[in-house]
């Protein structure tokens, strides 16, 4: 029954995402396709849950009152959307299932295989997946509580809060899960571990396919996520038992495989590519309404995890840098000396700011502790990680293979992010923006590792495009590659045992 109700939930949520996402993109002046509409709908829906959830958690209102207020907001918003689109909703639209399957079979396979491995994995049941006790406990215990945020969700004991625990109050996604699970009568642990995990895997595929479409032809874009099947390997949970040269040292990688429903997983898996997708138009032309949309989108993202704060700060630095570079190139082409000078000054200011952070003298015990802990992981993990060690090679290759300024701007943004986390050059900046939590920085590094892995897929596709003008071979190559990948690593792990 949980499976059937989950299907009903997906159908209703798809309509919600499409109608709301379409309205938001029209309102803020974005070009749109089905993928950007769904992504925008996801962000907008959880922005609506943040509005009510944040207020109710701050005021410690009851679950019943929260549920009523949240339902009223959705009824009003959805009622408006249905009324506005009433003519289109009842029109007959031809759905070509065969074309959908052909253009998205890799995404479907990705979501299906990862959710199957996640469900089959026994670690969540034996070890409670490290953080499930807190997050699933919070989702379950929200329901029916007389006062939100009134208990310790690790053990269920009542707490007396003096002041405001801003970090926990901002995170409203657990409350959203409680609301949707209760609304659709889905068993809440199942809703978290299965329903929302599958939702997030599908959304991950949609986000990266949209990003890939900015580099390669539409018909090739789904194949860009093939490298992420690498995370399926049996040894991947702890990244042990495989050759060091192909090992990915990625912090909290187990969450990608077994806890995709975590708010931190959503930020780590999708925040940077989503920021790129909706910030890219601003590189060519600054528009105030698009900046407002990114602010609202950021509020939605921070409702999942406050680790997003560091992500958006570092991304802002990267985006401003690339904006200055873009302006310089355009001014150079137009031979506008004044704007060339302004652009160069902008770049120098950014570089000066970054270099100045290296000389900040912060000697608090907490700061030193987190710098030391991060340094330990740098030596043990990142100095040996192939993606980070040879990242510059990947960036050089994809920059050469990129065919327009738009795709090169994306590469430039990620390159700046890569430089910011490379070899502890800007450790002080990273520690400050992580609010002295070293693991926050490591999760940001994981986001960049995912993008480098994605770029490897793009490089392969661009090379394929240049050699073969048709896509006859690529579906077969992808299928054979996936089978070989799983077989080889299963065989290797059997030998290791």
Where are these regions (language model features)?
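Membrane-embedded, hydrophobic transmembrane alpha-helices
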Residues: 1-100, 360-373, 412, 420
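Transmembrane catalytic cores of multi-pass membrane glycosyltransferases
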Residues: 1-5, 12, 127-136, 140, ...
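Membrane-helix boundary/interfacial segments in multi-pass membrane proteins
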Residues: 3-8, 58-66, 128, 242-267, ...
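Membrane-interface helix-loop junctions at the exits of transmembrane helices
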Residues: 48-52, 116-124, 227-251, 351-366, ...
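Membrane-interface alpha helices of multi-pass inner-membrane proteins
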Residues: 57, 291-308, 317-320, 347-351
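Active-site lumenal/periplasmic loops and adjacent helix-entry segments of GT-C-fold
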Residues: 116-270, 493-497
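Membrane-interface transmembrane helices that cradle and orient dolichyl/undecaprenyl
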Residues: 267-268, 272-292
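Signature aromatic-anchored transmembrane alpha helix within multi-pass, membrane-resident enzymes
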Residues: 340-348, 462-495
């Amino acid at each position: 029954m949980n499976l059937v109700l989950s299907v009903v939930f997906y159908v209703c949520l798809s309509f919600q995402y499409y109608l709301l996402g379409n309205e938001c993109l029209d309102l803020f002046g974005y070009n749109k396709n089905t993928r950007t509409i769904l992504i925008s709908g996801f962000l907008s829906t959880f922005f609506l849950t943040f509005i009510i959830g944040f207020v109710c958690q701050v005021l410690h209102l009851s679950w019943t009152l929260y549920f009523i207020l949240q339902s009223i907001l959705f009824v009003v918003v959805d009622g408006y959307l249905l009324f506005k689109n009433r003519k289109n909703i009842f029109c007959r639209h031809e759905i070509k299932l065969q074309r959908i399957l052909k253009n998205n079979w890799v995404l479907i396979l990705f979501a299906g295989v990862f959710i199957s491995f996640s469900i089959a994995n026994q670690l969540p049941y034996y070890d409670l997946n490290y953080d499930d006790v807190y997050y699933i406990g919070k989702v379950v215990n929200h329901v029916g509580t007389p006062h939100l945020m009134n208990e310790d969700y690790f053990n269920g004991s009542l707490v007396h809060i003096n002041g405001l625990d801003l970090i926990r109050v901002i995170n409203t996604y657990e409350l959203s899960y409680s609301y949707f699970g209760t609304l659709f009568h889905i068993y809440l642990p199942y809703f978290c571990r299965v329903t929302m995990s599958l939702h997030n895997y599908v959304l991950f595929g949609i986000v990266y396919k949209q990003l890939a479409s900015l580099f390669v032809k539409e018909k090739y874009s789904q194949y860009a996520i093939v490298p992420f099947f690498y995370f399926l390997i049996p040894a991947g949970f702890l990244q042990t038992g495989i050759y060091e040269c192909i090992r990915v040292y990625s912090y909290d990688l187990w969450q990608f495989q077994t806890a995709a429903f975590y708010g931190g997983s959503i930020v780590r898996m999708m925040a940077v590519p989503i920021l790129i997708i909706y910030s890219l138009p601003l590189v060519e032309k600054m528009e105030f309404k698009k900046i407002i949309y990114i602010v609202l989108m950021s509020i939605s993202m921070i409702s999942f995890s406050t680790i997003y704060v560091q992500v958006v700060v570092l991304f802002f630095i990267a985006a401003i840098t690339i904006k200055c570079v873009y302006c310089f190139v355009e001014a150079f082409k137009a031979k506008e000396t004044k704007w060339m000078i302004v652009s160069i000054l902008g770049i120098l200011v950014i570089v000066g700011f970054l270099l100045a952070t290296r000389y900040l003298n912060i000697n608090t015990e907490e700061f030193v502790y987190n710098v030391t802990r991060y340094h330990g992981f740098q030596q043990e993990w990142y100095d040996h990680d192939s993606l980070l060690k040879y990242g510059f090679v990947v960036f050089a290759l994809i920059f050469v293979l990129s065919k327009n300024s738009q795709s090169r701007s994306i590469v430039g943004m990620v390159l700046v992010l890569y430089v910011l986390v490379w070899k502890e050059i800007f450790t002080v900046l990273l520690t400050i923006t992580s609010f002295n939590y070293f693991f926050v920085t490591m999760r940001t590094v994981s986001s960049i590792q995912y993008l480098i892995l994605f770029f490897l897929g793009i490089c392969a596709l661009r090379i394929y495009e240049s050699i073969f003008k048709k896509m006859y071979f690529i579906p077969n190559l992808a299928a054979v590659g996936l089978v070989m990948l799983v077989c080889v690593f299963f065989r290797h792990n059997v030998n290791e045992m």
